[in-house]
Amino acid sequence: MFCSALRNILRNSQNAAKNATITSQIRNLRGQQSVHHEVEVLTSPGITTKQNDKKTEPAECEGSKEVALDFRNREAHVPSFNLAAYVNNSSTLQQFLSLGVDLHSIERRKGLGDFVLKLDFEKNVKPYITFLVDQGVSPDDFGRMFTKNPLLFKEDLDDLQTRVNYLKSKRFSDEARQRILTQNPYWLMFSTRRVDRRLGYFQKEFKLSGHDLRLLATREPNAITYNMEHLRKSVFTLKEEMGFNAKELSDLVVRKPRLLMIPPDDLVERFSYIHQDMGLPHAQIVQCPELLASREFRLRERHEFLKLLGRAQYDPQKDLYISPKTIVEGNNFYFVRNVAKSDLETFDLFLKTR
């Protein structure tokens, strides 16, 4: 059988690869030894080196007067106390645990542990639960929402209702509003004016209709409140470095808005492999935006395996066509059985000999 013969070839190449690796390691070891001796001769025992471990991060801002809210990237720190030690004596913490809140995750973010500990469940938490239930949010989502954004309890309830009413005025359906609130608990921290500016930016930048704008915001609510500097860099990368035209860019971000949140360097790396190595044109990439959302090494592994089997055929006008989006669907077992039409043993041997 073809797969059996292929496995024999892969095993032989694997042994050859091992020998080559051993030889390379010996050479590297010899090189390291010689370098080590040189360093010992040149380094004086009285000389010490210092490293500056301080790291600065660029400030994130939306405009000259508005600082972007970045709740997710709060600096992790060693908590001064453990919330678990207060659970037995705090009915609020007990209620949070029953809702599925991850107290350990909260206490690792500076200042939030102390804030949560001071909350009174009946006065400071229960009204917000009632508000969320009225918006159609499922109680099953409370734990994840409060873990991500406990600062929600600082917001005025009237302001929260105003922000929900804004979404209603923009014709977001009940299901869309529920998804936005559960998938992005930080959305309610943004004023209606600020959300309006964000939605306006997306509509103008990508020339979206009202329907497409609502579709984008519902599919990936986090994109609307994401750091503006990052969004602008991603748009520049998609336009100028990858060469998508205005229509292609619009279709791309509506179908997969999460692409705007991926680091631009990663996008370029993936696009380069998809466009040059796999040979897919821009129009086909727009139809399969999942490719750009997948890690480059995963694309490479699966494409090269299909190429080895003679099945890397992505032209729909030819026989044995394979839809590019199926390459990144499912786990390895699904890919090998349903796309490559092979077996895991052959695929594992292929990965070991790469």
From Swiss-Prot:
Q: What does this protein do?
A: Binds promoter DNA and regulates initiation of transcription. Regulator of mitochondrial ribosome biogenesis and translation that is essential for development. Required for normal mitochondrial transcription and translation. Required for assembly of mitochondrial respiratory complexes and normal mitochondrial function. Maintains 16S rRNA levels and functions in mitochondrial ribosome assembly by regulating the biogenesis of the 39S ribosomal subunit.
Q: Which organism does this record belong to?
A: Drosophila melanogaster (Fruit fly)
User: What if the gene is knocked out?
Assistant: RNAi-mediated knockdown is pupal lethal. Larvae display a delay in development and a decrease in body size. Display progressive defects in mitochondrial respiratory chain capacity as well as a decrease in the enzyme activity of all mitochondrial oxidative phosphorylation complexes. Decrease in enzyme activity is particularly severe in complex I and IV which also display a decrease in the levels of their assembled complexes. Progressive reduction in 16S rRNA levels and impaired assembly of the large (39S) mitochondrial ribosomal subunit.
A single Pfam family it belongs to is mTERF
The transit peptide region is found at: 1-89
Molecular-function annotations in GO: double-stranded DNA binding; large ribosomal subunit rRNA binding
What are its GO cellular component terms?
Answer: mitochondrial matrix; mitochondrion
User: Which protein, by its recorded name, is this?
Assistant: Transcription termination factor 3, mitochondrial
Q: Where in the cell is it found?
A: Mitochondrion
Instruction: Note the superkingdom of the native organism.
Output: Eukaryota
